[in-house]
């Protein structure tokens, strides 16, 4: 860790860049990284400063000093090129949970999208994005479906929960919001599923928890980079919740949602391969999903989805005739 900048009296911003000494399978990394974060947090307490962690990432391909390949300057994530992309999502998420549990105020992953820098800049190839920027592939990387859940539910102005576990290979963290809703993420580093009973102390549990799953052996990918839907509703039995966490996976449990069916999209019209529709007027609307079927009564599914967009039109590259449906997706993922 090294200091990059200081903003105001209350903050200290640092980055961790690469953790080149740790592979994705390293089971001690969580403990070591949490200790480093705790050291900085405690160092700043006497000065009444908060710690913001910026630009954190995993091991760099070619390592430092070996990133000039055939005259091309490269800065790329090792896991994206060594077959460990899906599994390494566990490590990047436990890195974030370690920071939360150590008292880090906020953090920023390196990076949201690949940077294909112009030739005159220092790096001509920068591949760290949750989204690819490539001539043949602009899709999401597997990390999006893991780290993206933390971004959605470990949100601004939430407060970290105190979480204890006797299992060294279960790494967890959570937050509670001002309205009493809460979210808990659990990373299972075991090679087998684990049954867990979670005791909820001083938390409201008057509605079922939505369970979101990132399984590194079966990544819930979307052609359109949509975050996965929740796969289970888990009722609270008193102050306890029972959950199964599959091997090498991440489970996120949350009550931070409103159970709501977005209003139907109207005015759908298809002409010469372009579909248009009336804009949603709901305050919590976020984007649209477009579907195409063979009959007017087809059922929208992940398999027949043809687009995700914030626009109110879509031009279908497939000239084949068909029927279209459009759904609104809201802030809680309802559609």
Question: Where do the PLM segments sit?
Answer:
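Aromatic/acidic polysaccharide-binding cleft in carbohydrate-active enzymes
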Residues: 58-172, 177-181
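Carbohydrate-binding surface patches
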Residues: 166-216, 248-254
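Pro/Thr/Ser/Gly-rich low-complexity, intrinsically disordered linker/stalk tracts
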Residues: 257-284, 330-335
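Solvent-exposed loop/turn segments flanking beta-strands in beta-repeat/beta-sandwich domains
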Residues: 280-302
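Beta-strand-rich modules
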Residues: 316-334
């Amino acid at each position: 860790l090294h200091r990059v900048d200081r903003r105001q009296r209350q903050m200290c911003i640092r980055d961790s860049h690469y953790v080149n000494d740790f592979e994705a399978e390293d089971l001690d990394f969580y403990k070591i990284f949490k200790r480093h974060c705790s050291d900085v947090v405690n160092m700043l307490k006497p000065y009444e400063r908060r710690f913001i962690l910026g630009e954190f990432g995993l091991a760099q391909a070619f390592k430092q000093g070996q990133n000039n390949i055939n005259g091309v300057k490269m800065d790329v994530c090792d896991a994206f090129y060594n077959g460990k992309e899906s599994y390494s999502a566990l490590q990047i998420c436990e890195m974030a949970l370690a920071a939360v549990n150590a008292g880090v105020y906020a953090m920023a992953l390196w990076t949201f999208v690949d940077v294909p820098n112009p030739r005159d800049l220092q790096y001509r190839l920068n591949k760290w994005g949750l989204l690819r920027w490539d001539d043949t592939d602009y899709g999401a990387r597997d990390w999006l479906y893991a780290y993206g859940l933390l971004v959605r539910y470990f949100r601004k102005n939430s407060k970290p929960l105190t979480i204890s576990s006797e299992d060294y290979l279960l790494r967890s963290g959570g937050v509670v919001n001002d309205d009493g809703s809460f979210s808990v993420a659990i990373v299972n580093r075991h090679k087998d599923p684990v049954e867990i009973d979670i005791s909820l102390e001083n938390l409201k549990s008057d509605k079922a928890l939505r369970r979101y799953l990132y399984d590194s052996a079966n990544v819930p990918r979307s052609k359109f980079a949509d975050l996965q839907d929740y796969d289970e509703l888990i009722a609270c039995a008193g102050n306890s919740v029972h959950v199964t966490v599959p091997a090498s996976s991440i489970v996120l449990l949350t009550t931070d949602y409103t159970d709501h069916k977005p209003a139907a999209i109207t005015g759908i019209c298809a002409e010469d391969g372009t579909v248009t529709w009336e804009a949603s007027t709901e305050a919590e609307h976020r984007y649209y999903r477009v579907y195409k079927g063979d009959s007017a009564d087809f059922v929208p599914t992940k398999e027949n989805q043809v687009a995700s967009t914030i626009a109110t039109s879509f031009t279908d590259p497939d000239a084949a005739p068909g029927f279209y449906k459009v759904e609104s997706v809201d802030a809680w993922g309802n559609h």
